[in-house]
Regions:
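Non-heme Fe(II)/2-oxoglutarate
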Residues: 1-82
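Catalytic core of non-heme Fe(II) oxygenases with the double-stranded beta-helix
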Residues: 57-173
């Protein structure tokens, strides 16, 4: 299986990247605790905030959350998706070791022309690992994009960063 994973460094201008980091780490941006990361009872936990969902039955209903414009608008404008399925911010906290192994997964299955982009809000020694062994390090203002059917997983950080923050964007093009 051929993996086409693209990385773009300095995806947004520096001021916008810093604004997103400052806003998402302020008291103005809520994080909701989840006692699983990928699958129910997977032994991992994280915080998240769904910023956009195309499904009526989802937590925020259909459409944009009130945080969408401040956090996502410029990202989406630059990515230029045909249709957005879901945008979710994820925050994982520091772990002592890499013993916390997040499971490989796909965000959606059977989506024609589906892509996933992960925008790294901050820098730390965590990242994203792919089924083929490729590792993308969490670096502020980097965007990694790959076909939605590629299995990937969170690699938690162990350095002195308080959190690993990403914005996960699922869409078609």
């Amino acid at each position: 299986m051929s993996y086409e994973v693209s990385e773009v460094i300095n995806f947004l201008d520096r001021d916008k990247s810093q604004f997103i980091l400052d806003y998402m780490t302020s008291l103005k941006f809520p994080w909701l605790y989840m006692n699983c990361s990928t699958y129910e009872n997977d032994g991992n936990n994280m915080f998240s905030n769904v910023l956009y969902s195309a499904w009526k039955g989802h937590v925020i209903g259909q459409g944009k959350s009130k945080y969408y414009d401040k956090v996502c608008k410029e990202l989406v404008d630059k990515i230029k998706p045909l249709d957005i399925l879901k945008i979710k911010a994820n925050l994982t906290t520091n772990v002592d070791t890499y013993k916390n192994v997040f499971p490989l997964h796909t965000d959606f299955e059977n989506v024609k022309n589906g892509l996933t982009s992960i925008y790294y809000v901050n820098t730390n020694n965590g990242g994203t690992a792919f089924e083929n062994g490729k590792f993308v390090k969490s670096e502020q203002n980097k965007l990694v994009t790959f076909p939605m059917h590629f299995k990937h997983r969170t690699v938690p950080h162990t350095d002195f960063s308080y959190a690993r923050i990403v914005i996960n964007i699922n869409y078609t093009r």
